[in-house]
Amino acid sequence: MFKEMNLNLKQMGNMIYEDPTRIQEEEDIVQEVSTTFSDEEDNSSSCSLSSSMCSDFTEDDDDDDVSSSSSNGPLEDLSDLMSHLPIKRGLSKFYEGKSQSFTSLGNVKSLEDLMKRGFKSRNYGAKRKSSRSTGGILDQSYKRVFSPKATISKKPNRTPSSVLSCLARRRH
């Protein structure tokens, strides 16, 4: 496949440029690219383009390769995946799961306490009823304070231009 590309590039280069030195330079570039691609196919390393860049790149990534090489193939099981994921650190180092409205987890004596407390905190009906009882009063006062006020504005006097012209003539 690469040889076919080389031939096509050479033919295109010969057709476009008649300068023999430029043709030779292009052939050299094409040859370098084709050897680079063939080297990459032969080696599993992706650093065959430049040895100086390759050495810089591999020195930085050596530590990462050691940590990722501890796995034995693809992660097929969820527990394998979980062991490779970073530990999630939140505000509480001692409690994992959904947050509850306990002021201290020391107050929790059993899982039943957690379940009861969780369901009580999810009882939104009582909260909604209490807000409805005071909501009417708050809504009325809010409407009185923030509603647009009725204003009476004077309409500008519109006098016909003929009247204005007459007034202007009388003054002179």
Swiss-Prot record:
Q: Does the keyword Nucleus apply?
A: yes
Per the UniProt entry, the effect of L91A is: Abolished ability to confer tolerance to stress (e.g. metals and oxidizing chemicals such as Cd, As, Cu, diamide or t-BOOH)
Question: Where is the motif Nuclear localization signal 2 annotated in this sequence?
Answer: 142-149
Name-wise, this protein is Protein OXIDATIVE STRESS 3
Q: What upregulates this protein?
A: Lower levels in the dark than in white, red and far-red light. Induced by wounding in an ATAF2-dependent manner.
Keywords in alphabetical order, please. Answer: Nucleus, Stress response
Q: What does this protein do?
A: Promotes the tolerance to a range of metals, including cadmium (Cd), arsenic (As) and copper (Cu) and to oxidizing chemicals (e.g. diamide and tert-butyl hydroperoxide (t-BOOH)). May act as a chromatin remodeling factor for stress responses. Negative regulator of flowering, especially during drought stress, probably to prevent precocious flower development and subsequent low seed set. Repress the AP1 promoter in a SOC1-dependent manner.
Summary of the tissues where the protein is detected:
Mostly expressed in stems, shoots and leaves, and, to a lower extent, in siliques and seedlings. Barely detectable in roots.
Subunit comment: Interacts with SOC1 in the nucleus.
Region of interest: Disordered: 34-79, 148-172
Q: Supply the InterPro entries for this chain.
A: OxStress_Response_Reg
Q: Where is the composition biased (Low complexity)?
A: 44-56
Ranges spanned by the short sequence motif Nuclear localization signal 1, renumbered to the chain: 115-122
- What happens after mutating S92A? Abolished ability to confer tolerance to stress (e.g. metals and oxidizing chemicals such as Cd, As, Cu, diamide or t-BOOH)
One BP term from GO? response to light stimulus
Q: What happens when the gene is disrupted?
A: Abolished ability to confer tolerance to stress (e.g. metals and oxidizing chemicals such as Cd, As, Cu, diamide or tert-butyl hydroperoxide (t-BOOH)). Early flowering under mild drought stress treatment.
| Major location (coarse) | nucleus
Q: Where is the composition biased (Acidic residues)?
A: 57-66
| GO cellular component term of the entry, any | nuclear speck
Which PANTHER family does the entry link to? Answer: OS08G0516900 PROTEIN (PTHR33172), PROTEIN OXIDATIVE STRESS 3 (PTHR33172:SF103)
Q: Which superkingdom heads the taxonomic lineage of this protein's source?
A: Eukaryota
Q: Which gene encodes it?
A: OXS3
